[in-house]
Amino acid sequence: MATLNPFDLLDDDAEDPSQLAVAIEKIDKSKKSGQVSSLPAKSAPKLPSKPLPPAQAVREARSDAPRGGGGRGGFNRGRGGYNRDDGNNGYSGGYTKPSGEGDVSKSSYERRGGGGAPRGSFRGEGGGPGGGRRGGFSNEGGDGERPRRAFERRSGTGRGSDFKRDGSGRGNWGTPGEEIAAETEAVAGVETEKDVGEKPAVDDVAADANKEDTVVEEKEPEDKEMTLDEYEKILEEKKKALQSLTTSERKVDTKVFESMQQLSNKKSNDEIFIKLGSDKDKRKDDKEEKAKKAVSINEFLKPAEGGNYYRGGRGGRGRGGRGRGGVSSGESGGYRNEAAPAIGDAAQFPSLGGK
């Protein structure tokens, strides 16, 4: 008899004891039914000879439980959801619509998703309450497959707005059948050329030999040779021809100038030169006179008629004194009626170094 590990039951502290009791009762019922069925005829179906121990039965039930709604994070926040039997609903996929015969992919999605929705499925595709692990609530009639997006996130650089010309029809490159037909025609043409070219091989060799002979004959022209005397004669003839042309071209017809008359110029060249020289002399004299005219400074220093002569002076040094040369009181400088200084007076303008 096999020995059982008494410590296996320690892992089931979080389980509901009522669920364990129900599981044990089911195992006992299966034992009784197995004993009763062994007595009648052999036509009865065979049941397992040895029932599983309660700890192993609970472990298998836990392993078959769904990952989603019926599993962790159900409505009861426990590991078993509502109840292990109710959570499984007689099927390892939890609250899901049982798949048809042979639908292996669908059952695998349901088992993985728990509530009928596959892992990572989108909303509107799966089973009932509890939802998938990542899918949320979903419908029972969903296929369990990820829907194809209308616009995939792909780079559009280098792509225009035109359609690719892959198909056949007007405005396209053509069908693959046409290319195959063209290739077959080209292969057939090459084969026919080979057949035709193999037969007249001898004729081609003879024709090539004749061509080579003609080419050799054409490449050997005779060089033109002449002596030195002949060359000098040719040069003399060329010189004579050139001299005859030059003498004929240099002849001038004097008959054309006989009808022409000489016109007399009234003004002689000497008179013209004299006038030009006199104009230049006048301009020089005018410049010299302007430079020699002396202008006295008194003309610039004289005030206007009826004006006062201004002599600059210092302003008063009192509080808030006015600017230099302004109107002030006392003996300070201001506007006075004084005569202009005489430049010729030696007292006013003494010469430097004078005695």
From Swiss-Prot:
Q: Where is this region: Disordered?
A: 26-225, 277-355
Q: In which tissues is it expressed?
A: Expressed in seedlings, leaves, roots, inflorescences, and siliques. Constitutively expressed in seedlings and roots.
Q: Which Pfam family is an annotated match for this chain, by its short name? A: HABP4_PAI-RBP1
Identify the Gene3D superfamilies for this entry: 6.10.140.1040
Signal peptide (from-to): none
Expression triggers: By abscisic acid (ABA), and osmotic stress (e.g. polyethylene glycol PEG). Slight transient repression by salt (NaCl).
What the record says about disrupting the gene is:
Larger rosettes and delayed flowering in long days (16 hours of light / 8 hours of darkness). Higher sensitivity to salt (NaCl). Hypersensitivity to the presence of abscisic acid (ABA).
**So where does this one cross the membrane?**
none
InterPro entries from the entry?
HABP4/SERBP1-like, HABP4_PAIRBP1-bd, STM1-like_N
What GO cellular component term, any one, is given? cytoplasm
Q: Which UniProt keywords apply?
A: Abscisic acid signaling pathway, Acetylation, Cytoplasm, Nucleus, Phosphoprotein, RNA-binding, Translation regulation
Residues annotated as carrying Phosphoserine in the record are 268, 351
User: PTM N-acetylalanine: at which residues?
Assistant: 2
Specify residue ranges for compositional bias: Low complexity. Answer: 37-47, 177-190
Compositional bias (Gly residues): 67-81, 114-141, 323-333
Q: Which PANTHER family match?
A: HYALURONIC ACID-BINDING PROTEIN 4, RGG REPEATS NUCLEAR RNA BINDING PROTEIN A
Query: Which protein is depicted?
Result: RGG repeats nuclear RNA binding protein A
Name the lineage.
Eukaryota, Viridiplantae, Streptophyta, Embryophyta, Tracheophyta
